[in-house]
């Protein structure tokens, strides 16, 4: 690596860890900025502008260690970071405006308390993102996509207190000048289920090295689904997945058995306002810390960390990278953006590998913190079962489901009157197109505006109690909640109580929706509804025109529906009545002949 590229890398890492370190220097009376991802990006840009290149490389890891010591105890970032003892240097981060200082203090620690979620921001795509796991993933990626070798024998112990990981300073070309002195007060203590007689005289040390092939899967023959199978411990864990997802997934599922339909993952919430958000209230006041915002931030951190670990030098400034990721796409790739985090995350966190990562992370935590109340006394087989359950639930209940924006996110007006509950599970999905709006919406602002427009039309012109559809699918990667899973809609006349009405925004008479929108309707939405007991396993899919005289959902889309496995071809389409030319001219411009009016 050239000296210039090395300096660039050190500056980028320094900026990130200065952001952590500023938590230790609160300023009284700081002004408040809206809790937007754009505000975080502006703060990063300010840090990048003020940080001298000669200092950034030396203070990066130390700032993260300092911030780690100021919050809830999590030994993994401290254990993984390279750098000298904090006592060897005095740190002097650049001064920021009171507004940016206050923002950094407010968002860099994630937490859930009294039904409120803290440390989260609203992103341009409409999603809410926890900043802490995002920053952890960026830092792990800047270190290089590294693999941590666990002891080959599950009963082996870690080095005694004060032991130095050998050759650590040569593990990454970006950090060759960094001497390692990785200490932990707990690493020399035996795991609760380790016998003294089992400890090999030659202790296996942890080795951290860059992974040239991405995430490594170890022990591929392990069978962790059966409690009667003696599990073999994984031999490596990936540091990127460890600090973003694996630790929190493992600890979450250690807390108690979860049902198949309610894993406690991904609780959504509502902002006090969308233009200047300040307070985020969870829809479930008893939600676990693994909220939708946390999982979004963790996935974003893992994806961007993976990108940073592979992108050639010089690496982009973090503010530039985040601006692209939460905008049009990283490096001009519209697929690599926050709208499609779940699809991209599914490729990065394949279930067998994620099981190994969660299991290995729990093993590492058990060695680092033998007195951990959740890990104490847990056998390897028990940890394997927890990891298997965690990976399965995360993959099926989160990655395999569409991202659904709740009503409050698009600014829905309240329901008029009292909604009528559905008798679940239902047996049908009824597919519509909106016709008006005719153009597919490809960003949150336009999709949300379309939702509000349709709701106003359904309320004020049609005289309905709410927007008619159960769900509406945009071309921005998101599904928008209409009446939702539990309330009778107004979408398919005489059939509203028998099925969910799902509309795709756009006119699909001659063109097809995006592949992402089709996948959400064909695969993701029904899969998750069946899994949650909302839709019958033998459900059927019908086009609107099969039940009502209408051209909906458009010829192109309907012909596509006919090729889908769940399509019920036994119900023949009903031909739409055509109005005379005179009556057509009398129709309001906002209500075309083929528009979806039940």
Curated annotation (Swiss-Prot):
One biological process term in Gene Ontology: immune response
Signal peptide from the UniProt entry: 1-31
What EC numbers are recorded for this enzyme? 3.5.1.28
Q: Which GO terms describe its molecular function?
A: N-acetylmuramoyl-L-alanine amidase activity; peptidoglycan binding; peptidoglycan immune receptor activity; zinc ion binding
Q: Which reaction does it catalyse?
A: Hydrolyzes the link between N-acetylmuramoyl residues and L-amino acid residues in certain cell-wall glycopeptides
Disordered, as annotated region: 172-194, 212-233
Q: List the disulfide bonds.
A: 441-447
Extract the InterPro entries matched here. Amidase/PGRP_sf (IPR036505), Amidase_domain (IPR002502), PGRP (IPR015510), PGRP_domain_met/bac (IPR006619)
Cofactor(s) annotated in UniProt: Zn(2+)
Q: What is its main location?
A: secreted
Residue sites binding Zn(2+) per the record: 432, 544, 552
Entry keyword set: Disulfide bond, Glycoprotein, Hydrolase, Immunity, Membrane, Metal-binding, Phosphoprotein, Secreted, Signal, Zinc
Give compartment(s). Answer: Secreted; Membrane
Sorted alphabetically, the Gene Ontology cellular component annotations on this record are: extracellular region; membrane
Taxonomically, the superkingdom here is: Eukaryota
Q: Which residues form the N-acetylmuramoyl-L-alanine amidase domain?
A: 428-554
**Which residues are reported to be glycosylated?**
353, 507
Name positions with the PTM Phosphoserine.
261
Q: Fetch the SMART domains from UniProt.
A: Ami_2 (SM00644), PGRP (SM00701)
Cite the Pfam families for this sequence.
Amidase_2
Q: Where is this site: Important for catalytic activity?
A: 469
**Functional description taken from the UniProt entry:** May play a scavenger role by digesting biologically active peptidoglycan (PGN) into biologically inactive fragments. Has no direct bacteriolytic activity.
Q: Which family does it belong to?
A: Belongs to the N-acetylmuramoyl-L-alanine amidase 2 family.
Write down what this protein is called.
N-acetylmuramoyl-L-alanine amidase
Q: Which organism is it from?
A: Sus scrofa (Pig)
The gene is PGLYRP2
